[in-house]
Amino acid sequence: YKVNVFAVAEITKLMIPFLQKGSHVVTISSMGGIQGSMKFPGLAAYSSAKGAVITLSELLAEEYKEQQIAFNVLALGAVQTEMLEEAFPGYEAPLSAVEMADYIYNFSLTSNKFYNGKVLQVSSSTP
């Protein structure tokens, strides 16, 4: 929880005074943090932390909607990373880290016009 929840909360708290009308905070979560999604053994701490980040972002969206600061969450599915390789040896994810980074970058710049307080599941496969 130290990195996946508490660090996100602390960084967000520190940045709030610098955010202006129209700002967009995008938090990265995981499909494992989505209630009702497929769960995998050995990922209890990770998945529950990602669920906590989802709830945090939903609450912040409500708290800062009057200031027109958007908070959204991208719950990522399988992306080819070292962590995925360790958790699922031999599995080939359909997306590279670079492809996902491009998606996150573009979402961050424009999606506050369309979303606030939303959790978007970004997955073309399982896990």
Predicted regions and their residues:
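Catalytic Tyr-X3-Lys loop
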Residues: 1-10, 26, 53
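Hydrophobic positions on the long internal alpha-helix
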Residues: 7, 11-15, 19, 56-57, ...
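Conserved Rossmann-fold SDR core element
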Residues: 54, 64-79, 114-122
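Short coil/turn segments at alpha/beta junctions that flank glycine-rich nucleotide-binding fingerprints
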Residues: 18-22, 63-69, 111
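Catalytic loop of short-chain dehydrogenase/reductase
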Residues: 24-52, 57-58, 62-66, 78
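Hydrophobic structural elements of the Rossmann-like NAD(P)H-binding subdomain
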Residues: 26, 71-74, 84
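C-terminal helical subdomain
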Residues: 73, 89-127
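Short glycine-enriched, charge-decorated loop/helix-capping segments at active-site entrances
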Residues: 41-44, 87-93
